[in-house]
Amino acid sequence: MAFISVDPNALLKALPYTGDGVAYGSGGNAVTGVGFQPDFTWIKSATTSEEHVITDSVRGVTKTIKPNSTAAEYTSSEGLNVFGADGFTVGSSDQFNTNTETYASWSFKGGTTSGIATNGSTTITPSAYSFNQSAGFSII
């Protein structure tokens, strides 16, 4: 049996950061040290009861969902605004970047957006997706 070696640090990074309250239009708060460009980031304040927030590259930056809420997806120009080569940049929204507040973030590396093979009878064609077969992680 062949074993596949997967480095979990290349696929998932938990990273605490401190908010600075800077609005995205003024540069925002660049959180670096992830080690890869994230495709999915989950953020939660570690110091207040703010809701959890998730942003992903398929839905698009500024599109946010709250997994611990019944609220629908919403758009925030002051939420997560950029997935960069080594992290992400957030604006001044309370759930992402209140000055001096501590946040926990979990960033996941997605994968490619091409190469989905079908058997010819597939009736669903996603408009956007990201999948990483070796990590067993997909965003559809």
Positions of the model-derived regions?
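Surface-exposed molecular-recognition determinants
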Residues: 1-140
